[in-house]
Amino acid sequence: MPLSQEEKQRIINEFKTHETDTGSPEVQIALLTHRINELTEHLRVHKKDHHSRRGLLKMVGQRRALLVYLNKISPERYAKLIDRLNIRTVIR
């Protein structure tokens, strides 16, 4: 299920780095994390929904790439974001 406009705006306002920010890595990762969490709950109920499972794996890969990028440009922002989102670190 897609994010409602209000829910998306709430996430953007919570994670934006400046007033007109909509595309920073933090915002993109937060939006992906929300969608991943919703899709994970959907897949717990609908175990045979393989199309959604593939979409979930693509989103996880995209989020991972953004997290690697964020860690490369600013390890402090990366550490703060994974704490706020309560996700595991992807950098070893």
From Swiss-Prot:
Any single biological process term in GO: translation
GO cellular component, one term: cytosolic small ribosomal subunit
Keyword terms, alphabetized: Ribonucleoprotein, Ribosomal protein, RNA-binding, rRNA-binding
Keyword Transmembrane attached: no
InterPro entries: Ribosomal_uS15 (IPR000589), Ribosomal_uS15_bac-type (IPR005290), uS15_NS1_RNA-bd_sf (IPR009068)
Transmembrane segment boundaries: none
Family: Belongs to the universal ribosomal protein uS15 family.
Annotated function: One of the primary rRNA binding proteins, it binds directly to 16S rRNA where it helps nucleate assembly of the platform of the 30S subunit by binding and bridging several RNA helices of the 16S rRNA. Forms an intersubunit bridge (bridge B4) with the 23S rRNA of the 50S subunit in the ribosome.
The name this protein goes by in its record: Small ribosomal subunit protein uS15
Species, as recorded: Symbiobacterium thermophilum (strain DSM 24528 / JCM 14929 / IAM 14863 / T)
Chain's gene name: rpsO
